[in-house]
């Protein structure tokens, strides 16, 4: 468990809010990190979700695909140094090679861990061996498999192996267009394909936060009261533009939206997924002095 001081540090790093605001947010929410972030947003201290960069654990994204199938796995380690370890890289390449034909969209991590990859050695056993050599915890965190007989699959893995994307497309895109679309998703982090795909619970939660922020502004300037509902709707619409893929300006050609690009190509995005190393994980931090003292006492 992270200490109160560590939670304040992580909350401040994630939201850019002041130390006192972070302390107050945690106190009002029983040290619940996610609720504290929400409280900061509702009270206008953090205005935009784009500023909420979660503290990431280390690791790599690994990916293998052809036109009709793709698998993406996140492997977590405790340090960036181990994430770049040559043996871990060789293991991940071998693992993908051995498991690619054996997995399907219903495959779970526990099944992958049991697959033999080399001389009767299971994935879990090889990971444990690398972990013992590096003296770090190394785990498979999550996996996703796309598979289709009639549609196209495109992927993108960023050079640093920290971001990966898989898309399933209905229609015909050439290889460059498919890769560029995957790159766009990697760079712009859409959450939904279009408004019909939006999670309504999420949208209502965001609308409530936007309303709280707007009402605070009205308290500061009562003249804004007559524009309250229009302000809220405008901000909700902007949020939908930012988070829905087809509404976003196309990274490769900003004169058109993704929706316009797909219409020109007579193609449709059926689904996509974007992985980023450590997203959603709160990493515990230990200061250098404490770490040295702990080692001395061992």
Swiss-Prot record:
UniProt entry tagged with the keyword Lipid biosynthesis: no
Species this protein is from: Mycoplasma genitalium (strain ATCC 33530 / DSM 19775 / NCTC 10195 / G37)
Gene: tsf
Assigned protein family: Belongs to the EF-Ts family.
UniProt GO cellular component terms: cytoplasm
GO biological processes: translational elongation
Single GO MF descriptor: translation elongation factor activity
UniProt name for this protein: Elongation factor Ts
One Pfam entry name: EF_TS
Record NCBIfam families: tsf
Function field: Associates with the EF-Tu.GDP complex and induces the exchange of GDP to GTP. It remains bound to the aminoacyl-tRNA.EF-Tu.GTP complex up to the GTP hydrolysis stage on the ribosome.
Keywords: Cytoplasm, Elongation factor, Protein biosynthesis
Localization of this protein: Cytoplasm
Region (Involved in Mg(2+) ion dislocation from EF-Tu): 79-82
Transmembrane segments: none
């Amino acid at each position: 468990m992270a200490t109160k001081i560590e939670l304040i540090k992580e909350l401040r790093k994630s939201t850019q809010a002041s130390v006192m605001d972070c302390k107050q947010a945690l106190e009002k929410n029983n040290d619940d990190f996610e609720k504290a972030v929400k409280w900061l947003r509702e009270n206008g201290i953090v205005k935009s979700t784009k500023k909420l960069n979660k503290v990431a654990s280390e690791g790599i994204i690994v990916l293998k695909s052809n036109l009709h199938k793709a698998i993406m796995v996140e492997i977590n380690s405790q340090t960036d140094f181990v994430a770049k370890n040559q043996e871990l890289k060789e293991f991940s390449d071998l693992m993908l090679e051995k498991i690619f034909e054996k997995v399907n969209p219903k495959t779970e991590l526990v099944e992958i861990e049991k697959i033999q990859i080399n001389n009767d050695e299971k994935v879990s056993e090889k990971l444990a061996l690398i972990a013992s050599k590096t003296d770090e915890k190394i785990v498979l965190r999550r996996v996703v498999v796309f598979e289709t007989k009639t549609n196209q699959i495109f992927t993108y893995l960023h050079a640093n192996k920290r971001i990966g994307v898989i898309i399933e497309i209905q229609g015909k895109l050439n290889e460059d267009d498919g890769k560029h679309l995957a790159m766009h998703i990697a760079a712009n982090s859409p959450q939904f394909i279009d408004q019909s795909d939006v999670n309504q619970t999420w949208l209502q939660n965001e609308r409530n936060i936007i309303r709280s922020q707007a009402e605070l502004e009205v308290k500061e300037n009562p003249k804004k009261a007559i524009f309250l509902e229009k302000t809220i709707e405008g901000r909700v619409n902007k949020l939908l533009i930012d988070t829905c893929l087809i509404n976003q300006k196309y990274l490769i050609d900003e004169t058109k939206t993704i929706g316009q690009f797909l219409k020109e190509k007579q193609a449709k995005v059926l689904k996509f997924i974007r992985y980023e190393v450590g997203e959603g994980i709160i990493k515990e931090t230990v200061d250098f002095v404490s770490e040295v003292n702990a080692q001395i006492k061992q």
